[in-house]
Every structure is written in C-alpha cells, then in structure tokens.
C-alpha cells in the first residue's frame, strides 16, 4: 500500500513518512503540491489516501484543498489534511473537501515541547 503526500511537510511528519512507515510496508510517494495534478499522477491501484498540510510548516506552502480533494474523490480516496499550523480558526479543511483533519494540540497548549496532546 502507499499514500501520496505533499513534500512540503513538518520535519517530524516527513521523518515518520520517510523512515517509519516504510518499515511497516507503507510506501509514501512525495509530490510537489504546488501542482495539484501531481497527486493523481503519482497514484496507482495500491494508493490508499492523499495527504497534505493546509499550510505547510515551515515552508508556508498553501495546498489547493478543493482541487486535491476532487482528485482524491475521483479516485475513491480520502484526503487527509494536517491543519495544525493554520489552526481551525484560520482554515477549516472539511469546508474544502477534506475527509480527515488532524491537528496537534501539543503545538497550541504550550508550543515548547513541555506538554503532550493529541
């Protein structure tokens, strides 16, 4: 199985996708999200999801969630969006076609790595 992901990711997410998921048999195909058509071009019959950050950390790349979600849905795939950096106040990915939205409470409770939240 594989997922197609933007290559503009928070470092911890990139490490998880690049180093940890392959040990579990999950391949991650990194694409340049500046061109949303790259997601569908990288997908195949073993692709299970598309992943991106609404606003990437630290590059500040903004993904076109509506176009990427349409590409995902045309292939019967979910779009997973990490919206930690933009916060739910500034961006609501569900309103733009995302199927799963994740956000790190740890970033907003303290921001210094002294607390932990999901």
Report the location of each language-model feature:
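Conserved PLP-enzyme active-site core in the AAT-like
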Residues: 1-117
